[in-house]
Amino acid sequence: MTPTVTVQLTDDTAKRFEGHAKLLAIGTATPTNWVDQATYPDFYFRITNSEHLLEHKEKFRRICNKSKIRKRHLVLTEELLKENPNLCTYNDASLNTRQDILVSEVPKLGKEAAMKAIKEWGRPISEITHLVFCTTSGVDMPGADFQLTKLLGLNSSVKRLMMYQQGCNAGAAMLRLVKGLAENNKGARVLVVCSGITINIFRGPSLEQDDNLLAQCLFGDGSAAMIDGKDPRPGLETPLFELVSSAQTIVPNTDSHLKLHLREMGLTFHCSRAVPSVLAENVEDCLVKAFEPYGISDWNSIFWVFHPGGNAIVDRVEERSGLGPERLRASRDVLSEYGNLTSACVLFILDEMRKKSKKDE
């Protein structure tokens, strides 16, 4: 005889699963140092002692001109590069140098964004119950989450989660993760911090690796933080966005198109030219699966927080999805002003969206 087990939710447990997580505050930060994209090719080839590679320099200039990026903020300065010449070659062993810088700077930049989010939230820092930290810049133990806990003075009992090496996927992954944490832990207030610094991928040019030039043109440094929770307290907390649902999809046979590998020379970047087309050809299937349950099929009727992996990606997705120019405006603006900020990019765009909404009210 097969036993029968009946499970009944108590009133308290049932209430825990009611309602959606809300985004309660956002903060962003960038290094004070920034580079002008129009003149960056001259700086890059000079600082890497590669000015003799005239054709390669002109190729890099064309890539920068087509990027639609106006400027990027970088921790790397000319002084820092002169002090560490092994960062300026293509393949010299330099992982220790990069790690020494990143382990210190990533949590510091994350703190700046976190403090802004906490200030906007307006509640005591002691009410933060969970901390999630994400970066693709360096690896260390104790991790950047532990270092940030000390920098902010969080409770020693805060529940921490450290996520390394998520790349550009991290922004959406953080939203998915924080939704689960906020909705399944009564009274939770989750601080999420994404901090990225490109020292791990900066290197001199290589005649054999053109995708390295794309990496040197595309990525910028920045951090973003958000505070999430369920059941905002009236008069004390102001919800900005509601996290209704989340999903993730793997497109088969695409794992070779975009790869990053940690080596003695740092983090190497390899990107296929097919990436914009692959994304554009598959985005609609993802949209249908996500929005069909809600009866939505007009992609111009929703607001887009689209990670701008690069200008070509934004163009192809906009064209293939039949979007009007305003749908991806916030993504284009963030790309123009900061470059690709990897994990922090989505939160920068959310911040841009809410600022625009306030202006339009």
Swiss-Prot record:
Q: What is one process in the GO biological process aspect for this record?
A: polyketide biosynthetic process
Question: Which pathway does UniProt place it in?
Answer: Secondary metabolite biosynthesis; flavonoid biosynthesis
UniProt similarity note:
Belongs to the thiolase-like superfamily. Chalcone/stilbene synthases family.
User: What Enzyme Commission number(s) does the record list for this chain?
Assistant: 2.3.1.74
Name of the encoding gene: CHSA
Q: Name one Pfam family in it.
A: Chal_sti_synt_N
Starting at the broadest rank, the lineage of the source organism is:
Eukaryota, Viridiplantae, Streptophyta, Embryophyta, Tracheophyta
Task: Show the catalytic activity.
Answer: (E)-4-coumaroyl-CoA + 3 malonyl-CoA + 3 H(+) = 2',4,4',6'-tetrahydroxychalcone + 3 CO2 + 4 CoA
Xref: PROSITE patterns: CHALCONE_SYNTH
Enzyme kind, highest EC tier: transferase
The active site lies at C168
GO molecular function annotations of the record: naringenin-chalcone synthase activity
- This chain's protein is named Chalcone synthase A
Q: Which InterPro entries match?
A: Chalcone/stilbene_synt_C, Chalcone/stilbene_synt_N, Chalcone/stilbene_synthase_AS, Polyketide_synthase_type-III, Thiolase-like
